[in-house]
Amino acid sequence: MAVNDVNVFYGAKQAIKNVGLDIVAREVTAFIGPSGCGKSTFLRCLNRMNDTIDICKVTGDIRLDGEDVYDRHIDVVELRARVGMVFQKPNPFPKSIYENIAYGPRIHGIARGKSELDEIVQSSLERAGLWEEVKDRLESPGTGLSGGQQQRVCIARAIAVSPEVILMDEPCSALDPIATAKIEELIDELRSNYTIVIVTHSMQQAARVSQRTAFFHLGRLIECGDTETIFTNPQHNLTQGYITGRFG
């Protein structure tokens, strides 16, 4: 994805100011910065989740494979299949585990029959590292799983419609350390097939899972580069101050 001069307004308030960056394919890009810096707002621009907010206006250019995602001819439902989203709080549908995964492929016409749908469900759960844990209870409610398992259901649900990009908005913030470690391991495995963008408040998590890191402050992108450089040799004083804990 390529982003150029993006601004976001909520009414008269400007939340994102002139942000531009390239999101590299088959890598994990982490967005870091203090609370309220705009990183989640910017993330939601990438698949037009901000469209659901009446007073939100987005200007600038965001392209997926060269195509303007804000073009008026874009099918937003199709866009959100290509650029999936995993939210901060696990939000499985109030359906069975099977139906949570099958729903997307069914409505998008991806599966041509029950056997193909079964294959997609199994493959998606396998990629999310959950198949062995749930294969004997696929008809059980997705909401009955543990928090970490529910988040992996949500990741499998995104995978099931063959996205190019997966957006993750603080996917581990509601999870315990063991579940967090499983999600981080999963992110590392998924990046060989998907472009992943993750918002995180944890600099340690950004350092562990990402290849590139973007630091936001007061709605502006201050610095973006390879993760090791951002954490060991930042070029901007604001980045240095945040990384070293002088503010947060």
From Swiss-Prot:
GO terms for cellular component: plasma membrane. Its main location: membrane. InterPro entries: AAA+_ATPase (IPR003593), ABC_transporter-like_ATP-bd (IPR003439), ABC_transporter-like_CS (IPR017871), P-loop_NTPase (IPR027417), PstB-like (IPR005670). GO terms for biological process: phosphate ion transmembrane transport. Keywords: ATP-binding, Cell inner membrane, Cell membrane, Membrane, Nucleotide-binding, Phosphate transport, Translocase, Transport. It catalyses: phosphate(out) + ATP + H2O = ADP + 2 phosphate(in) + H(+). ATP binds at residues 33-40. Signal peptide: none annotated. The complex is composed of two ATP-binding proteins (PstB), two transmembrane proteins (PstC and PstA) and a solute-binding protein (PstS). This is Phosphate import ATP-binding protein PstB. It comes from Rhodospirillum rubrum (strain ATCC 11170 / ATH 1.1.1 / DSM 467 / LMG 4362 / NCIMB 8255 / S1).
